[in-house]
């Protein structure tokens, strides 16, 4: 993840990390103002000059303009591998890293789990979503997040990110993992399960948003 090719593959797609934005309704409109801004962003990506996309130097300039990367975000990214290794030791599961996974049926929808698990004998498939927050946030999540409902309540965008992973990979679960190496018990694992009603609502809103993107591009 986070390589230049990874960013290229995500371009113009509705992605797991942002999909929660589409799930917020406006007071009078189908989409909230935040959702509309995201739709405009996806439309702009899909309508980008291909010469810019395919030129590494120019595309790097573009990424520098659009990507926010705070110290806290970079620290979280740097800690992901440690979180994955500890998860493997605790669960005995072998986790592989994966890139952007496109949904098999919903056009322009993709998600990038922080890890993927597959058991060849049983066919069991699972995903990881790893967050490495500061200590106060770690304690908040550890005390308040225990299942689907509480994740939706505490951090709705992470809930929809976990759902997107399962939709795009066909996984039977996503383990939502929070990690902070400074704590005496540095990892908290919450099993998030698929919800077909949520999947259906997500698909509906993604398809409506995608139609708007196509209209925006064709209107030029």
State what each model feature region is.
Residues 1-78, 86, 144-152:
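Charged, glycine-rich intrinsically disordered N-terminal tails and low-complexity linkers that flank
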Residues 79-80, 157:
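Residue-level preference for nonpolar/small residues embedded in alpha-helices
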Residues 86-218:
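Nucleic-acid nuclease catalytic cores
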